[in-house]
A protein has these predicted regions:
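A well-ordered secondary-structure block
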Residues: 105-189
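N-terminal targeting leaders of exported, membrane, and organelle-targeted proteins
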Residues: 2-96, 102, 157-190
């Protein structure tokens, strides 16, 4: 019975992720106590969230390279914008491109005085769990980043953003206290 409940829970998370992955092209702040390996990496001084964000950038650029497109460059301003949105989705308990203050990604960029000519956003979430349906064990930076990027890749709207005419990418990752990772990608042409 417990096994069935766990399978149902995994299917729910996967279905919810897939359904939310179909959002348009515009797409929070807590601590994580029970996610393994959250301490800083002594070699790089990066948090787990930053390592995951780097892997998401790399995987996105691999997709772009396979299509003969230029790579996106990491941008600190866009990272900040993306991280704030991921944190806010957790803090204010919503999952949407329009935030708790009814602001779109472009409005949030304007609020932070970030210049842009084009902007788009992908959001998603994945549990940090031993057996996520469709993803397997997501309890590493490599596997959880692969899971969310593949989810976006299999969603026409998100994929269009990933291969779109953008120059820069910001990635924000935040975890809930019950180990659900929220992801935001912000694409920009400055």
């Amino acid at each position: 019975q417990m096994h069935c409940l766990r399978i149902i829970q995994q299917m729910f998370f996967l279905l919810l992720f897939i359904l939310q992955s179909g959002c348009g092209n515009e797409s929070i702040t807590t601590t994580v106590d029970n996610v393994e390996n959250m301490e800083l990496n002594s070699e790089t001084d990066l948090t787990l969230q930053q390592i995951i964000a780097q892997k998401i950038l790399e995987k996105t650029n691999t997709i772009r390279n396979s299509r003969g497109l230029s790579e996106l460059t990491q941008n600190d301003d866009m990272d900040q914008l993306a991280e704030l949105h991921s944190l806010n989705m957790i803090e204010y308990n919503f999952f949407d491109h329009v935030d708790h203050q009814n602001k779109s990604p472009s409005q949030r960029a304007d609020d932070l005085n970030f210049e842009w000519r084009r902007i788009a956003e992908n959001i998603g979430y994945v549990p940090w769990f031993e057996n996520v349906v469709g993803c397997g064990d997501t309890r590493s930076a490599e596997s959880i980043s692969e899971c969310v990027v593949e989810g976006w890749r299999n969603s026409p709207g998100h994929y269009a953003n990933m291969i779109g005419e953008f120059d820069q990418l910001g990635v924000g990752v935040a975890f809930t206290n019950d180990s659900i990772a929220y992801f935001t990608q912000v694409f920009r042409v400055p």
